Amino acid sequence: MSTTTLTRREQRAKAQHFIDTLEGTAFPNSKRIYVTGSQHDIRVPMREIQLSPTLIGGSKDNPQFEENEAVPVYDTSGPYGDPEVAINVQQGLAKLRQPWIDARNDSEELDDRSSAYTRERLADDGLDDLRFTGLLTPKRAKAGKCVTQLHYARKGIITPEMEFIAIRENMGRERIRSEVLRHQHPGMNFGARLPENITPEFVRDEVAAGRAIIPANINHPESEPMIIGRNFLVKVNANIGNSAVTSSIEEEVEKLVWSTRWGADTVMDLSTGRYIHETREWILRNSPVPIGTVPIYQALEKVNGIAEDLTWEAFRDTLLEQAEQGVDYFTIHAGVLLRYVPMTAKRLTGIVSRGGSIMAKWCLSHHKENFLFEHFREICEICAAYDISLSLGDGLRPGSIQDANDEAQFSELHTLGELTKIAWEYDVQVMIEGPGHVPMHMIQRNMTEELESCHEAPFYTLGPLTTDIAPGYDHFTSGIGAAMIGWFGCAMLCYVTPKEHLGLPNKEDVKQGLITYKIAAHAADLAKGHPGAQIRDNAMSKARFEFRWEDQFNLALDPFTARAYHDETLPQESGKVAHFCSMCGPKFCSMKISQEVRDYAAAQAIEVGMADMSENFRAKGGEIYLKREEV
């Protein structure tokens, strides 16, 4: 029975079973490896795909094989991808970064929560059954201290997080010796800096320049360090979160784990339903990747969904609440200014961003400037105290092809550039959010405008969707735009699922969105010429030409679907060693024919060579031994 036919109670029970039985799991024929850094507790996880040997000759009784190197790949699954790690969602993940945070001695534990709302929730006994039991005592910067990775980078300090990232971004490609696998086409990088080897110093320099961010709240020590920047691998974000009509805590934790398994580099919790606070705590304590939020959503819930009733005080309390839970980055729609709202009146689809529409309504109802803009420096002070990165929201992004690249969109973008410089005054890390719905020929301008207006801060886009005619397939329409803008320099792509514009995504939708966007991100890395990006493609092509079916499945982004499609028509074990598939059959397989041509050409070359030598022998008189002067 599919999840779409399950009742709400059945869906929740299924999610609870998933959590209760959760174990570390490796992909088929893969194993978890750890690459160590300069200190013993820097252990960077990667997945190594084991490959079978290639048959190169010999006889049936005595075949000769050539080994194929294992292929290391980037792994976002954290402890969930390691069969040796015991998983207990009730206890949460190990606090990987806690020793590094403590060693810096620039933060301190709080005696009480700073948020009045958090204190109210903790005092409510009726929430005991929902509450995560292993609550952390929150930390914040000591007086006069700054705890951000940008602050350290500007001081010339290479943190353990930066070294971890350098190792991770290299993807273990130094382990590969095969020239066939190492071959790579030169890319077109549009001005990106892509060194052959990423060093901790390079990471530090990129962060110091504001070209990259490391989302790493000191209250989320469970997260594995990662980086977002155009001079690094293109990253993918997955959105999860409940709504007023569907989903539960169990289902959101399940979606979190599922997202990291299928390659989410970060996850945004966009919950708008009941128990937002409790749901987020469960997610953070069990997340190996950075978690982002849109705080205005929860602030709106606190005023019963009435945008006009929002206040700076309620929003500030929400920031403190989420900061002390461990949220790694905030989307803040501070660029939706009162004077920009009329620009959207002539649009076909108006303001489609939830956060943007909330702030636009507030501005119009009070005829005041956006309080997020007015209080932006105070927002930066909060972020600096916990190392929360800012994701400056594109509240005026286009919601249709017709509205792409209009005055409202780019006016807001220019304001985001001004806000970026203010955030940098506080050593707060910044990335910029982008559209939206943009046809292919108008996408590159978005990237060039962002780099110029926002001082090369990382760009983070939703797609963009390249056409509006395909509800149910918007992971395709947006995946096209995502691949293009990733190539042009976008640092992180926010996935779109098949349910976009239609409903809240379920577990399978999350997977489909992530696979689509991992394809887009990887295609962008290839096009940029990112060092090592082609290794997996080369390994796949070699396996395909040699009819190593098991290796083809295991090298795929989704081994299970690849195997299932193959086995629909050739389910027998013999089909997995056959030199053909059901598309062409045994007589018309182009690769089989190519192999035969290659073998024939090699045999012909030997025959021609022997004939040449024979003719040469006869031309020299047919003597077995030549005279010294003839040698």
UniProtKB/Swiss-Prot annotation:
One of its GO terms (molecular function) is carbon-carbon lyase activity. InterPro entries: ThiC (IPR037509), ThiC-associated_dom (IPR025747), ThiC/Bza_core_dom (IPR038521), ThiC/BzaA/B (IPR002817). Its EC number is 4.1.99.17. It is an enzyme of class 4 (lyase). [4Fe-4S] cluster binds at residues 581, 584, 589. Zn(2+) binds at residues 437, 501. Substrate binds at residues 239, 268, 297, 333, 353-355, 394-397, 433, 460. Binds 1 [4Fe-4S] cluster per subunit. The cluster is coordinated with 3 cysteines and an exchangeable S-adenosyl-L-methionine. Its cofactor is [4Fe-4S] cluster. One of its GO terms (biological process) is thiamine biosynthetic process. Pfam families: ThiC-associated, ThiC_Rad_SAM. Homodimer. Belongs to the ThiC family. This is Phosphomethylpyrimidine synthase. It comes from Salmonella paratyphi C (strain RKS4594).
